[in-house]
């Protein structure tokens, strides 16, 4: 899974009833906003398509996109999604862009509405099957265990030209490598021991 992923907000959906069907309906009704700043990125459209194709409940996947674009590019044309209620798009000419923090703040201020969860990504990702339910289940289980979790990871690599070949299918985490001479810390990716046997996230010190 491309887990440069952060769930940063949680609202409780009240549902006090029994039965498998009720649980499934409750799960499918929980919405998740994919928080995507995109700067002239040819991988934006493939990222959107892969997210929807691999979601267990694609109707509950919403998109908040800050599109910093050049109209001459064409590869990030979102016209096919402009009438889709799941998509909220803020467009600006790439010459007006002010950097990643500005784009993320713009999404927070104008595109984040009443979704139950937020999944903060870059605009170049691939997804595993049922990624939406996996993340929500992990989050909710941690809440039930008494935590107030943020779920994240260090994104493993993929090659957009050959994908799905050459994908790195091992999840990574953020590790401290050293301090720079001027005092800031250098973060690098590292493997997660025994990840094949894990059923839930592990505690971490750093968030990518």
Regions found by a protein language model. Give the residues of each.
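Catalytic cores of eukaryotic secretory-pathway lumenal/extracellular enzymes that build
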Residues: 29-208
